[in-house]
Amino acid sequence: MIQELGVMLFKEREKMGEKQKRVADGIISISEMSKVESGGHEIDYFTLQALFERLGKSIDKLELAVSGEEYAAISYRAEIEHSIAEWDHERLTELIAGYDTYNDNKRSIHKQYKAALWAMACYMKKQDHASCLCGMEQALACTLRNDWRRALGAGQRLCNQEIRLIMVIAYCLWELGDISGLSGHLEQLCSYILHHYTDTEEQVKVYPHCAW
């Protein structure tokens, strides 16, 4: 099924007139993207999800039949997010330490997620916005080569994970009083979500974070 989704990704990208580079950049190489889109190469669930999200599409509604390992990885992330919602620093750090057991730590999307989790764990313990900002910016750089403000202006495609990181970064900047041009950049981000996240399922994932 994962391989079939690669072909679907190709068809969707072609229909939208998007180049491979704009979708794959920072997540996987162009050569690997070609193999995925031909159905001849499998990548993990979260990496594939990020590629679809950069097209504004959701793989959730496809009711994807995942393997036992992929289900365990998805469940593990859900447990991580629950620990954050419960503000349980000790549990979160335990879960971060075990993250690589379920995911490929060489993939940029997982490096980014893990880096963001460490930044969040640090914030939960110290409530230090400057440290959190630094950590989140480093996490975002795992997939975005340019500063996020410049990326928005250049029409960079973004996955859900990148959008959430940008929102946390914006929040930290606001708390630190560094608000020059911030509202304009956030308006650009909101406009991007409205125009490029065409699947309602993906919009629903992002809107609660926007409200927060």
Which ranges hold each PLM region?
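Residue signature of alpha-solenoid helical repeat architecture, marking inter-repeat boundaries
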Residues: 70, 108-111, 153-162, 201-205
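A short, Lys/Arg-rich alpha-helix, primarily the initiator
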Residues: 1-15
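"A position-specific structural signal for the A-helix of alpha-solenoid helical repeats
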Residues: 8, 74, 78-81, 110-121, ...
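Alpha-helical segment of the N-proximal tetratricopeptide repeat
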Residues: 75-102
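Amphipathic alpha-helical segments of tetratricopeptide repeats
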Residues: 93-104, 137-150, 184-198
